[in-house]
Amino acid sequence: MLDTDIFSYASKGTNQEVFRRLSLVSVGDVYISVIVNAEIEFGIMSSPKPERDRERSLILLQHITVLDFPREAVHDYGLIRSDLQRRGQLIGANDMLIAAHARYLGLTLVTNNIREFSRIPGLTLENWAE
C-alpha cells in the first residue's frame, strides 16, 4: 500500500527509485487507501497547476487499486491512536488511518515517512524513496 508521499513521487516522476520499484510490481499488487486518495485530491486542489496534477494522478491511478476503508479497521485505528497518545507520540490523523488500514489488511505500507510510521507496532514498512 502506497503512502501519499510515494504516490506523489511516482506521479511527478521526482524519484527514480520509486519509479523503478513500481515497475517491478505487478499492476494488481499496488494499492492506495481511500484516505491517500483524499490526500491526493487535496494536493491537486491546492496546487498552482491543478489540471496538470490531476492528469498525472489519473494516469498513475489507472494502474493502482484504491481500497475502501473497512469498518473493521476502526478497531486498529483506536488501538494505534490510544497507544501513540499514551506514549506522547501522536502522528497526523490521516497517517493513523492509513496505518490502521494497512495493518488491518496485512499490507506493507510503502512510505518515505519511516520515522513516524515506525512508532506503530505491527505495521510493516518499506521505503522505496531511498
List the predicted regions and their residue ranges:
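Generic structural signal for small/hydrophobic residues in well-ordered secondary structure
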Residues: D3-T4, V18, I40, Y77, ...
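Short catalytic/metal-binding and nucleic-acid-binding patches
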Residues: I32, V36, G43-P48, L67, ...
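Active-site neighborhoods of divalent-metal-dependent phosphate/nucleic-acid chemistry enzymes
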Residues: T65-V110
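Short, well-structured N-terminal submotif of metal-dependent ribonuclease cores
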Residues: M1-I32, I44-I59, R86
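Acidic, PIN/NYN-like endoribonuclease modules and their adjacent C-terminal/linker elements
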Residues: A99, R103-E130
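Alpha-helix capping/helix-boundary segments
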Residues: I6, V36, A73, I98, ...
